[in-house]
């Protein structure tokens, strides 16, 4: 006969083991404000209030929508939102890093990133060499000012390059400077790579994650471009979001950032946030 105490102990062990095998999303979570670009163009204060009402406290900057950096910072403060990262134009990083640093100071972000490397029809090894020079130089100056530099993947970097890809070449070319990476799981998938495996391959280089799903049936390419309608609510598309979250937790991703490129962010952003609140992994 099994004693009551032994049975209860076994039951507790069973549940504790199950709990150890699964977990809920803990974040920290932010919203890339580019998701709300059309709304922000019409009404910055009202849109930021909606973002706060969705339950967000943190955001990633994606432009100023007709305001100065100082004015936009004031609107964030009024809405009760904090910018944790921002994107800067490649040419500004190359030609006017002091301006970028000045704007980063206004928003008091930790990360300053670049989301697009100018290039011709195809991304080339020469583009990697040039961008690595710009990124390395910018990263050193940003670090001296108290910030971290990161590059946001956009899909075109996965063109084959020997036994690897041009992304591998970019990682290697920026290994001596403090250059970090932001894995956009939509664009990584669209470019033919596996976002979870990429995190596992470079666990020391990824610090931010763009959570974005891709419409089922979408065929990717290496252009870094896709129709906005191929961006769908998180958890409803073809990206293995759960697998990405498992890999991200293992390597210690600092920020999980929802981004929507769809024409329905007021529907898809809350739906994606709700998905994260319910998922177990």
Regions found by a protein language model. Give the residues of each.
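N-terminal pre-domain/capping segments
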Residues: 2, 19-111, 204, 278-281
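Bacterial N-terminal signal peptides
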Residues: 6-16
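Hydrophobic faces of well-ordered beta-strands that scaffold small-molecule active sites
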Residues: 27-32, 59-61, 83-88, 112-114, ...
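Conserved, mostly hydrophobic/aromatic
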Residues: 31, 51, 59, 76, ...
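Active-site beta-loop-alpha junctions enriched in small/polar residues
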Residues: 34-36, 62-64, 88-91, 117-119, ...
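Active-site acidic/histidine proton-transfer and metal-coordination neighborhood
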Residues: 57-58, 65, 90-181, 266
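Acidic/histidine-rich catalytic cores of soluble enzymes
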Residues: 144-238
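C-terminal helical cap(s) of enzyme catalytic domains, especially alpha/beta-barrels
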Residues: 265-281
């Amino acid at each position: 006969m099994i004693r009551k105490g032994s049975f209860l102990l076994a039951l507790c062990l069973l549940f504790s083991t199950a709990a150890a095998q699964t977990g809920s999303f803990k974040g920290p979570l932010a919203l890339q404000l580019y998701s709300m670009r059309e709304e922000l163009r019409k009404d910055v204060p009202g849109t930021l209030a909606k973002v706060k009402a969705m339950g967000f406290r943190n955001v990633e900057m994606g432009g100023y929508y007709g305001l100065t950096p100082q004015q936009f910072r004031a609107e964030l403060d009024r809405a009760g939102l904090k910018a944790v990262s921002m994107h800067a134009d490649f040419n500004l990083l190359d030609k006017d890093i002091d301006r970028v640093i000045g704007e980063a100071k206004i928003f008091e972000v930790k990360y300053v990133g670049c989301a697009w490397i100018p290039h011709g029809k195809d991304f080339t090894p020469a583009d990697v060499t040039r961008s690595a020079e710009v990124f390395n130089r910018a990263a050193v100056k940003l670090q001296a000012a108290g910030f971290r530099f990161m590059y946001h993947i956009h899909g075109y970097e996965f063109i084959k390059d020997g036994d690897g890809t041009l992304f591998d070449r970019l990682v290697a070319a920026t290994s001596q400077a403090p250059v970090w990476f932001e894995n956009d799981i939509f664009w990584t998938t669209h470019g033919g790579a596996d976002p979870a495996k990429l995190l596992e391959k470079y666990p020391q280089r990824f610090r931010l994650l763009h959570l974005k799903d891709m419409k089922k049936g979408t065929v990717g390419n290496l252009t870094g471009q896709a129709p906005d309608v191929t961006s769908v609510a998180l958890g409803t598309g073809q990206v293995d979001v759960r697998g990405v979250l498992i890999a991200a937790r293992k390597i210690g991703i600092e920020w999980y950032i929802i981004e929507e490129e769809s024409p329905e962010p007021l529907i898809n952003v809350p739906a994606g946030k709700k998905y994260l609140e319910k998922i177990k992994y």
